[in-house]
Every structure is written in structure tokens, then in C-alpha cells.
Amino acid sequence: MSYQVEVCIDNIESLHNALEGGATRIELCSSLALGGLTPSYGFMTLAAKLSTVPVYAMIRPRQGDFLYSDDEFAIIQQDILSAQQAGLQGVVFGLLTADGDIDVARTRVLIELAHSLQLGVTFHRAFDQCRDPFAALEQIIDLGCERILTSGLAASAPLGKEMLTQLVAHSQSRLAIMAGAGVSPVNVADLALTTGVKELHLSGKSTRPSKMTFIASGSKMGAADQDDFIIPITHTATIRNTVLALKSIS
């Protein structure tokens, strides 16, 4: 298949579902509801053992923006080491300055660290919060990233098709532009054909009910409107249908 389908997951059940659906790469996270945070070392280790395709770990120490303190930067470096020690193939991160530019100095340190550990690097959707996407694109290329995950600076990739098309043209195959946010079996073929992207990113999110037979109703583990007995998972058929839609245009 000439297209890559990366599936972002935040639990081991979703790993099995993504692989069964035909994912060609995994982005390993925790807390997808928060945009994806760094997965645990245990999760990284087991995913490395089970996966039949490359696994890249999200390296994001907290929710929120991508302007990191010195302590957070130290955490990021340690988590990159952990990803390599767990046996993963790559890492995913993004760092910005306060005024919306790529934090070139710190990003260079992280990329050099990752490359010294034989890890690939994806620059994530922090890119979509840059003030000058084309300057940022050139900086990320110069820094040596393999790809950029982006919605085309829009709320979703289908809404960002014009920018995605421009980014693909400007990149001139010096790195991959991977479209993500709102990608589905319904829109993926049009998205790929219209923009020229060869890599697509989605979660294929669904839910399943808890297998608990006793449901405690008086306590909450998270937000008041969050159902603790609904488990978010990747939907196998969504991934499979996305892969099939792309095969139909390959």
C-alpha cells in the first residue's frame, strides 16, 4: 500500500484492534481525551513486544500548551530514553516558544538525542499552533524530523485541505506531511487525493461498556460528566475501512 495509516491509541485493547484493522504504524499515548500524553513505560514495553508495525511514543509531559519549563524539558529527555529502552521505533513531540515559533534550540537537542538512540521523530500538532507555518516547516525539515502531523492549522484535516496541499507542495518530499484530526473512512480518500498526503493519522475512536458486574454509583474518578464505566477504544472496522478506502485509490 502506498499510504501509511497511523493509529493513535491509549490502551492495550486498542493496540490489538488497530493492528487487526491494518494500521501500518502506531502512535502510543495516554489520555487521548487530553490530546495525548506520554504513555507509561509498562505500556511502551508491552506494545513493543506485541506490535507487528512500528510504534512511536507520544512524548508530552502534560496537557495544555507546548511551552515547557526546564523541569518539563528534562522529563521529555528522560521519556525519550525510556522509549528507546522499551524497544520502540520512534517518538513524537513538539516544542514552541512563547511567541508561537518552533523552539529550535531545544528541539535540536531532542532530535539529536532521538537519532543517537536510533529513534525516528515526528513533530506533532504543536505545528498547528505556529504563527508562520511555512517558516516552521523549513525549520523542522532542517532539524531532521521524518514527518509533521498536522490538520493544516484547522479544527480538522478536512477543513485544512488547502493548507495541507500547500504544505505538501512546499515540503517537496523532504519530509512527510501526515494529515490528522477528523480523518475517517468517509473522507480519507478525498483528503489524500486532494492534498497529496501519503500518511494519514486517526484514532478510530469508539467505546465499549465496562465488564464490571457491580457498578458503583456514588463515586467519580474524574469529571462529573465522565462515565467511569465506558471504556474508549479504537474501533477495528473504522481502521479497516480507512485502509480499504486508501487501497481503492492506490
Swiss-Prot record:
SUPFAM superfamilies for the chain: CutC-like
One of the record's GO cellular component terms: cytoplasm
GO molecular function term, any single one: copper ion binding
Gene3D superfamilies xref list: Copper homeostasis (CutC) domain (3.20.20.380)
Pfam assignment, any one: CutC
Chief localisation class: cytoplasm
Alphabetical list of InterPro entries matching this protein: CutC-like, CutC-like_dom_sf
Entry keyword set: Cytoplasm
HAMAP family: CutC
Membership in a protein family: Belongs to the CutC family.
Listed name of the protein: PF03932 family protein CutC
Species of the source: Vibrio vulnificus (strain YJ016)
Gene: cutC
